[in-house]
C-alpha cells in the first residue's frame, strides 16, 4: 500500500488520527515534526525562534522526501502544504488526507498550548487568516474529512471508508 500523508491545520487531529489509523491498518506511523525535532536536536518552537520559519520549512521538505513511500502513515506539520514541491511529492508518492476542522474550534483547543510557534500570540484573526491562506492547498488532497465536533471513532469510520473506495 502507498504511504498515507495526513495533512491539515494545527490542532485538526493529525497526530491523534495517525496513531489510531496505524493500529487499524497495521502500518507504522511517522510524525514529520517529531522526526525534525530528533534530527535537529531541538524543539520546533526553538527552530522557529533561532533559525526562522524558512529554515524549518526546508527541514520539513527534506524530511518528507526521506521517509518511506510504502506502508507507512505520515503525519505532517500544518504548513508542509505551503510548498508546491511538498504537495507534488505527497500526491505522487501516496494518498493525501486532509483533516479539516473549523478554525474557531481549533483556536479554542489551542488557546493554552505553548508548543505551537505560530499560535503564540493567541491572535484569533491572524490564526484564521493563516488557515484561509492555506486552505486551497489542503483541499488538493485526495481525501477530505471534516473533524469538527466529531469523535475519533466517527472520524476513523469515515476515513477507513474513503481509503477503501
From Swiss-Prot:
Q: What is its EC number?
A: 2.7.1.71
Q: Which residues bind substrate?
A: 33, 57, 78, 134
Kindly list the biological process annotations in GO that this record carries. amino acid biosynthetic process; aromatic amino acid family biosynthetic process; chorismate biosynthetic process
Q: Name one GO molecular function term.
A: magnesium ion binding
- The organism sits in which domain of life? Bacteria
Please list the cofactors this protein needs: Mg(2+)
InterPro entries this protein is in? P-loop_NTPase, Shikimate/glucono_kinase, Shikimate_kinase/TSH1
Q: State where the protein is found.
A: Cytoplasm
The main enzyme category here is transferase
Chief place of localization = cytoplasm
Amino acids binding Mg(2+): 15
Which reaction is recorded as catalysed by this protein? shikimate + ATP = 3-phosphoshikimate + ADP + H(+)
Q: Identify the metabolic or biological route this protein is part of.
A: Metabolic intermediate biosynthesis; chorismate biosynthesis; chorismate from D-erythrose 4-phosphate and phosphoenolpyruvate: step 5/7
A GO cellular component annotated for this chain's UniProt record is: cytosol
Q: How does it assemble?
A: Monomer.
Q: Which PANTHER family does the record cross-reference, listed alphabetically?
A: SHIKIMATE KINASE, SHIKIMATE KINASE 1, CHLOROPLASTIC
What does it do? Catalyzes the specific phosphorylation of the 3-hydroxyl group of shikimic acid using ATP as a cosubstrate.
- Protein's UniProt name: Shikimate kinase
What organism does the record attribute this protein to? Bacillus mycoides (strain KBAB4)
Gene from which the chain derives: aroK
Amino acid at each position: 500500500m502507498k504511504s498515507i500523508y495526513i495533512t491539515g491545520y494545527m490542532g485538526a487531529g493529525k497526530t491523534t488520527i495517525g496513531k489510531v489509523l496505524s493500529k487499524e491498518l497495521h502500518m507504522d506511523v511517522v510524525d514529520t515534526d517529531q522526526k525534525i525535532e530528533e534530527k535537529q536536536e531541538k524543539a520546533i518552537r526553538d527552530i522557529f525562534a533561532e533559525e526562522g520559519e524558512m529554515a524549518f520549512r526546508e527541514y520539513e521538505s527534506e524530511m518528507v522526501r526521506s521517509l518511506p513511500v510504502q506502508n507507512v502513515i505520515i503525519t505532517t506539520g500544518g504548513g508542509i502544504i505551503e510548498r508546491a514541491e511538498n504537495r507534488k511529492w505527497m500526491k505522487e508518492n501516496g494518498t493525501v488526507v486532509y483533516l479539516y476542522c473549523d478554525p474557531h474550534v481549533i483556536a479554542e483547543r489551542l488557546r493554552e498550548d505553548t508548543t505551537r510557534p505560530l499560535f503564540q500570540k493567541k491572535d484569533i484573526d491572524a490564526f484564521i487568516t493563516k488557515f484561509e491562506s492555506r486552505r486551497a492547498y489542503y483541499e488538493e488532497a485526495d481525501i477530505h474529512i471534516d473533524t469538527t465536533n466529531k469523535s475519533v471513532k466517527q472520524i476513523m469510520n469515515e476515513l477507513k471508508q474513503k481509503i477503501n473506495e
